[in-house]
Amino acid sequence: MLEKIQVILQYLLPIRWITYLAGLGASWKGGWITRYIILLFIRIYKINLQECIDPNINNYKTFNEFFMRKFNINTRSIDKNPSTLIIPADGIISQIGKINNTHIFQIKNSSYYLDQLLAGHDNIINYFRNGSFVIIYIPPQNCHWVYMPCTGTLRELLYIPGDLFSVHPKIIKNIPDVLSRNEKLICLFDTQFGYMAQILVGSAIVGSIETVWCGTITPPRTGLVKHWHYPKSYNNNITTKSTERNAVILSKAAEMGVFKFGSTVINLFSNDTVLLNEKLQLNNIVKIGMTLAHGKIN
């Protein structure tokens, strides 16, 4: 019954206005009130501040600052094997597996295809036919930074406007095509394992999506598709972020983007170049740095 009510509210509530107002509230410098809200949030969700670069809550002037708190990557064991790809975010695996031509997965009566998820961009769709994928739901209490599974050079960036339904697994199960219908940021990387898409999916109450190379992508929400192209790298020894010839290069385990509230990250991998870790299963709780897959170097 509760699940049905949650689904109905997704249609009835003015989600965009709620998201806008939540963004304003989270940016408010409320002094002791803000600190109290942050402390309450920490206690409710049992957040481990020792994983943060700055564990002192007095240094966070807004709730957004706390939400975007920098995660200390050194608190995690990163799989440094050059032939492995790592989990890009703290969260829960909501789906994982192989792509059958362009069919990604089915849940209840809803089928997800590359065509819908990638907004009909055939040049990108073709990279991932018969490839593999993983979808990680990031709960509100988790670190909201998304990291690189492997070193990659950014080639294309697409902002696709859309709905702002919740991406909680219960909602995805009951509302058709949420991940395709919601706004999203599609980042296409060229890697040593072939092309990889890292997709940041917007959601209810997500006030902003940002990347490390161009800052805030949304808001404002203009309803327009935006498409950026980036040059190839000319550096044969890519290990760090670089602006060589304007190329955007991010190393494995580097920060890539951030949500200003919990949401979902989707990774797509090219056919026959990436073998997913067989130990990973649906609903597994995963941490940044764990082994996601093994890759074949092109």
UniProtKB/Swiss-Prot annotation:
Active-site positions on this chain:
90 (charge relay system), 263 (charge relay system), 263 (schiff-base intermediate with substrate)
Pathway-wise, it operates in: Phospholipid metabolism; phosphatidylethanolamine biosynthesis; phosphatidylethanolamine from CDP-diacylglycerol: step 2/2
Copy out the cofactor comment.
Binds 1 pyruvoyl group covalently per subunit.
Cofactors: pyruvate
InterPro entries, A to Z: PS_Dcarbxylase (IPR003817), PSD-B (IPR033177), PSD_type1_pro (IPR033178)
Gene Ontology biological process: phosphatidylethanolamine biosynthetic process
Name-wise, this protein is Phosphatidylserine decarboxylase proenzyme
Q: Which organism is it from?
A: Blochmanniella floridana
